Amino acid sequence: IWRLAQQVKVRQRVIATAVTYFRRVYTRKSMSEYDPRLVAPTCLYLASKVEESTVQARLLVFYIKKMCGSDDKYRFEIKDILEMEMKLLEALDYYLVVFHPYRPLLQLLQDAGITDLTQFAWGLVNDTYKMDLILIYAPYMIALACIYIASVLKDKDTTSWFEELRVDMNIVKNISMEILDFYDTYKIDPQRGLPEDKISPVLNKLPAKS
């Protein structure tokens, strides 16, 4: 989905919605039942319509075939995406609303007075869609975890601000650990991810109580 989205040039919110649909579908359907090579572009197609940034199905098929190359012929066509769209709608119970962490992220950064961390924290939120967090946690809790990680890495003291929040800090800690584990597991470039020697300090500074 990410690679295809880059080719057709859609907004990040469209990508996030498509990824969420993709993950939701496979909590109910198996990959043997619904081929992910067809589900992925269909989720992007559906998300682009829901987010009012419609991408034509023919463009999706064109770029997928281009990405696959001659050695790996992509057998699905436009009609397959349109047919799968109806199946996905049914699998999703026609519930297409997705609440993302982006809006609460901006609001919370403003409240904390650290809007200079917006770009860094936004990047962290983007990466959470490579995990299952959006299916498990409330969007604003994901936003808080990304703000916390960003504030520690950028040496911003947000301790008192976090203490004033009426949220379960254990949940924020759990989300932070999952994000950090993701970076550590996949050895993300320290320039855009998290250096290994930063992981323990981040977790140690996290308030343990709500």
What are these regions (language model features)?
Residues I1-L180:
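Structured all-alpha helical bundle cores of eukaryotic regulatory proteins
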